[in-house]
Curated annotation (Swiss-Prot):
Protein name, per record: Diaminopimelate epimerase
Pfam families in the record: DAP_epimerase
InterPro entries hit by this protein: DAP_epimerase_AS (IPR018510), DAP_epimerase_DapF (IPR001653)
Gene designation per UniProt: dapF
Pathway, per record: Amino-acid biosynthesis; L-lysine biosynthesis via DAP pathway; DL-2,6-diaminopimelate from LL-2,6-diaminopimelate: step 1/1
Entry's localization field: Cytoplasm
GO cellular component, one term: cytosol
The reaction(s) this protein catalyses: (2S,6S)-2,6-diaminopimelate = meso-2,6-diaminopimelate
Source organism per UniProt: Clostridium acetobutylicum (strain ATCC 824 / DSM 792 / JCM 1419 / IAM 19013 / LMG 5710 / NBRC 13948 / NRRL B-527 / VKM B-1787 / 2291 / W)
GO terms classed as biological process: lysine biosynthetic process via diaminopimelate
Lineage: Bacteria, Bacillati, Bacillota, Clostridia, Eubacteriales
């Protein structure tokens, strides 16, 4: 990727990469190799504009790839509403693949806002579908890490009256906050209602929260739907799928140390949840990192003037993921 500044118009031309992890789609901007001199206000404005599906490219967020003093690279993610997220599992898979190919390595360590993660190449989850694994170890059930104002140190299968009297939630932090409820049937309207409450009831959740409903299909398959903080109802949220896997193991719906197929509206991933002798959780998080198209975006004083896209380079892997998606629909019922 490279930057081209047209002196006559003060327009900065930025190359972009559209990518997705299980349908959770992003625009990737490479600040590692290019000094764009973007400040956070500009990053926020880019996210709000570029993620608008009606007017621009559309997406759930912007992935900024930067240099790191402690890892191979750093990921920052700004949601579609302009807020910055601490972590995004689906986005991290895309950034991980990008940095792996950029540095010609088999694995890389990526710094995020509050932690760091190893990302490793894996055998394709489906023919032609590029796949990586993230080692997720930054897991906490302490309500202070969300933060959540609750009477006990942990919230495990209990109600939060301010949000709902119907569902039993478990609180999990994977550097970003999650409330997980295991349900018999996923009601999207109720999920949205609770998700909105969870992000507006600051007395309970001062920094908001991601809310997920989990339907257990059988002892090795679950289906997850998520209301994502800063996004809304989403096809996929990587850390929500990770948190849902942990909660499903705690509830003895699936087993620790066994592969779990986690389905959602965007496709499927695999997880393996581990619990050590000290009660600490870690997760192998395995899924696609699909590149969709390359393009350019012209930026004039934080305002996007126009953009172009070229879908030809990644057409084959996009088609492969579409085949994989149809395959997952047959197996998640």
């Amino acid at each position: 990727m490279e930057i081209n500044i047209r002196e006559d118009a003060f327009i900065v031309e930025i190359n972009i990469l559209k990518c997705h992890g299980t349908g959770n789609d992003f625009i990737l901007i490479d600040e590692y190799n290019n000094n764009y001199n973007l400040d956070d206000e500009t990053r926020r404005d880019i996210a709000i504009q570029a993620c608008n599906r009606a007017k621009f490219i559309g997406g759930d967020g912007i992935l900024f790839v930067q240099k790191s003093d402690i890892c191979d690279a750093k990921m920052r993610i700004f949601n579609a509403d302009g807020s910055e997220a601490e972590m995004c599992g689906n986005g991290l898979r895309c950034v991980g693949r990008y940095v792996i190919e950029m540095l010609n390595k088999e694995s890389v360590e990526i710094e995020t806002l509050k932690s760091k993660y190893w990302v490793k190449l894996q055998e394709d989850i489906y023919e032609g579908v590029k796949t990586v694994k993230i080692d997720i170890k930054s897991v906490s059930l302490d309500v202070k890490t969300l933060p959540l104002n609750y009477k006990k140190e942990k919230l495990i299968f209990d109600k939060i009256p301010e949000l709902s009297d119907e569902f039993d939630f478990t609180a999990v932090s994977i550097t970003n906050p999650h409330l997980i409820a295991i349900v018999n049937n996923i009601d999207s309207d109720k999920l949205v209602e609770i998700g909105k409450k969870g992000n507006s009831t600051k007395s309970v959740l001062p920094q908001g929260v991601n809310v997920s409903f989990v339907k257990v299909i059988d002892s090795s398959n679950i289906y997850v739907k998520t209301y994502e903080r800063g996004v809304g109802l989403t096809k996929s949220c990587g850390t929500a799928m990770t948190a849902s896997s942990i909660v499903s193991c705690i509830g003895e719906k699936v087993q620790f140390d066994n592969a779990i197929n986690v389905y959602n509206d965007g496709g499927a991933i695999k997880t393996i949840v581990h619990k050590d002798s000290n009660g600490n959780y870690s997760v192998d998080f395995i899924g696609n990192a699909t590149f969709i198209f390359e393009g350019t975006m012209e930026l004039d004083k934080r305002k996007i003037e126009q953009f172009t896209i070229d879908e030809s380079k990644f057409e084959k892997e996009t088609n492969s993921y579409n085949e994989f998606f149809e395959y997952t629909r047959k197996n998640c019922k």
